[in-house]
Amino acid sequence: MDPCDCSKSGTCNCGGSCTCTNCSCTTCKKSCCPCCPSGCTKCASGCVCKGKTCDTSCCQ
């Protein structure tokens, strides 16, 4: 279950550089922000997005 309710209005700021709309949270699962695409194996469930690309710096 995704802890981020993306149906809420507002802005979701994941980490220092990832921003997605229609969220109201500060930490997101990979499905919430584009920097953590669903196919990114480096981003575990409940990750905090740190970047916009799927690499070692994407999530902490």
Swiss-Prot record:
Classification via InterPro entries: Metalthion_dom_sf (IPR017854), Metalthion_dom_sf_vert (IPR023587), Metalthion_vert (IPR000006), Metalthion_vert_metal_BS (IPR018064)
Binding residues annotated for a divalent metal cation 3, in chain numbering: 14, 18, 23, 28
Entry-linked Pfam families: Metallothio
Keyword Metal-binding: yes
GO MF term (any one): metal ion binding
Residues binding a divalent metal cation 2: 6, 12, 14, 25
Residues where a divalent metal cation 7 binds: 49, 54, 58-59
Keywords, ordered alphabetically: Metal-binding, Metal-thiolate cluster
Residues annotated as binding a divalent metal cation 4: 32-33, 43, 47
Residues the entry annotates as binding a divalent metal cation 6: 36, 40, 43, 59
Described purpose of this protein according to its UniProt entry: Metallothioneins have a high content of cysteine residues that bind various heavy metals.
Name of this protein: Metallothionein B
Organism: Dicentrarchus labrax
The organism's taxonomic lineage, starting at the top: Eukaryota, Metazoa, Chordata, Craniata, Vertebrata
